[in-house]
């Protein structure tokens, strides 16, 4: 579908979804954001739903300002995927050992490594910029510096919620490795600190929604946030890179005889800020549950733990600020999913997938998400499909 413009907004809100299908609270969030004087436009992706801080599946383009609550607490959350030389025929009939080996190599939930991972020992890890990255830790907010040891030990860990690690097959039978994670606790600590700082500023006292508090260009507060934001985004990138290196090491050991090779890793943020230029304006573009889909940009759009995912290539549609959806999008809250579905439902909806099927992940059941095929179809003018994947192993935190 092409986009529709939402009526009654202060600036253009272009929506790649049927407005009638979007919750009223999410529509109100979008209209509230449109009232900010720095806003130049909003794009809304087909996986749109109500979110904390700002609407998930929204792209917020501002000039001279940024809203830290819109970025959210998982700064730099995103996806990584890599195609391997393995095929479905190489996989064992019982995939439980493979799942167990992944869980042993990569801490999940609140877990962390006993010692910081040495990236120099990991297969294919891009060490460029690693030392400089950690050298900048001394320049981030004093309020979180005491978390350095935890930050080093959580580097290369999954977390919980909708974060996952998967073995997938594409339609040709090739095996892909895929994972989803962000900046872990250090990102949350930085986000919480700066959201609190923004809400104290005088120019944010009369907002329609206190979550819309912004930092303004050329102020010390904006400079501090940008520094910490971009550092946390880099943390998330390295976190996924280390996990992918650990994942690849598991695969190489488990399939020694196959002498596995890997294509270049595809990686993309979907909760972040980027400096981009549109219509002659330098803008700060916040993608809150959206990926960059500039012309030729590769991206990853996952479904749920029992449905397909897609590797896509951006078409460079500037009406969407070169963006696309970050996933299928929730059709109900976590609490609603827990009330509606049982572990039996989870078992039925994840048949054929080696994964957890207990009450702790019922809120991640496929039925709690929108149909991924519909979401992809609604953004045919934003991305083209490169590969469709279906998971056979899924590790959740």
Spans of model-derived segments:
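Domain-length cofactor-binding catalytic modules of enzymes
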Residues: 2-29, 37-41, 50-56, 65-68, ...
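Active-site- or binding-pocket-proximal scaffold segments within functional domains
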Residues: 122
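Glycine-rich phosphate/pyrophosphate-binding loop regions near the starts of catalytic domains
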Residues: 59-60
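Compact, glycine/acidic-enriched structural inserts
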Residues: 78-117
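N-terminal cap/recognition module
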Residues: 64-85
């Amino acid at each position: 579908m092409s986009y529709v413009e939402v009526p009654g907004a202060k600036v253009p809100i272009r929506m790649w979804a049927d407005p009638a299908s979007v919750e009223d609270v999410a529509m109100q969030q979008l209209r509230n954001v449109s009232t900010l004087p720095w806003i130049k436009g909003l794009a809304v992706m087909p996986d749109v739903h109500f979110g904390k801080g700002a609407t998930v599946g929204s792209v917020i383009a501002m000039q001279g300002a940024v809203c830290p609550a819109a970025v959210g607490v998982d700064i730099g959350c995103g996806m990584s995927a890599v195609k391997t030389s393995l095929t479905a025929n190489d996989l064992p009939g019982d995939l439980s050992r493979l799942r167990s080996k992944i869980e042993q190599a990569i801490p999940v939930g609140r877990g962390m490594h006993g010692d910081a991972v040495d990236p120099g020992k990991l297969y294919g890890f891009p060490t460029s910029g690693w030392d400089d990255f950690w050298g900048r830790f001394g320049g981030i907010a004093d309020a979180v510096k005491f978390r350095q040891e935890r930050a080093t030990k959580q580097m290369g860990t999954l977390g919980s919620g909708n974060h996952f690690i998967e073995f997938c097959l594409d339609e040709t039978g090739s095996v892909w490795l895929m994972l989803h994670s962000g900046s872990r606790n250090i990102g949350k600590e930085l986000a919480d600190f700066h959201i609190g700082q923004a809400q104290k500023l005088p120019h944010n006292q009369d907002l329609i929604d206190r979550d819309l508090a912004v930092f303004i260009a050329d102020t010390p507060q904006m400079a501090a946030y940008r520094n910490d934001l971009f550092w946390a985004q880099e943390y998330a990138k390295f976190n996924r890179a280390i996990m992918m290196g650990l994942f690849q090491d598991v695969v190489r050991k488990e399939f020694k005889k196959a002498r596995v090779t890997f294509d270049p890793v595809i990686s993309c943020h979907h909760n972040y800020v980027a400096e981009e230029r549109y219509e002659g304006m330098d803008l700060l573009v916040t993608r809150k549950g959206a990926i960059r889909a500039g012309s030729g940009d590769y991206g990853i759009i996952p479904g749920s733990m029992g449905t397909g995912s897609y590797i896509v290539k951006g078409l460079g549609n500037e009406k969407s600020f070169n963006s696309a959806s970050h996933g299928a999008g929730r059709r109900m809250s976590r609490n609603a999913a827990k009330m509606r579905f049982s572990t039996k439902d989870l078992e039925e909806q994840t048949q054929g997938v080696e994964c957890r099927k207990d009450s702790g992940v019922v809120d991640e059941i496929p039925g709690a998400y929108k149909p991924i095929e519909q979401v992809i179809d609604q953004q045919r003018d934003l991305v083209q499909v490169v590969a469709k994947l279906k998971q056979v192993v899924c590790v959740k935190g």
